Amino acid sequence: MGIAVEVRKVYPYPFQHVVNSYLNKYPTPLEKHVLAIKTVEEKTDPASGVVYRKRIATCNNVIPSFLQRFSILKVSNVYLEEESWLDMKTKVMTLKSRCLTWAQYATMKEESVYKESIENSNWTEFTQRGTVTITGAGFLNRVLETFAQTFLNQGVKKSISIMETILRERCGCPFS
């Protein structure tokens, strides 16, 4: 079956500020569940100038304890892989993320885009689509998908709030 979460947001800050804030957002005291982010690969295409990065995030397992009684869910840390392509010429950064921890039981993906706004070059448009499909947990599939949908909705709101806070702290008042 699966679930999907979509969000759109305009940050009233220039693309460069938003991208720098995003790439340096974690770890932060504003989000206790993201423990570390490690860049495992980074390269720049000499022809296009596009910067490719692959990062691994280490996060706390936020699955409720009553569900962690099932051995497949009882892990202390969850690992996420993020790939990004940053094109400063076109002012677009595309990201794809997936969960590595439960890959044999579920497909969890996010696709995000940050790009300079066509309405105002001092603004940055953000779009994100996340999907979760759980197939390997038997009767728990739907329960876990419902939890995932609630968690993703809350996570998106919190992530946007963290970005807004970091942008205000680093860049001051928003641009109009």
From Swiss-Prot:
Residues annotated as domain PRELI/MSF1: 1-175
Biological process terms in GO annotation: phospholipid transport
GO molecular function: phosphatidic acid transfer activity
Matching Pfam families: PRELI (PF04707)
GO cellular component entries: mitochondrial intermembrane space
Listed name of the protein: PRELI domain-containing protein 2
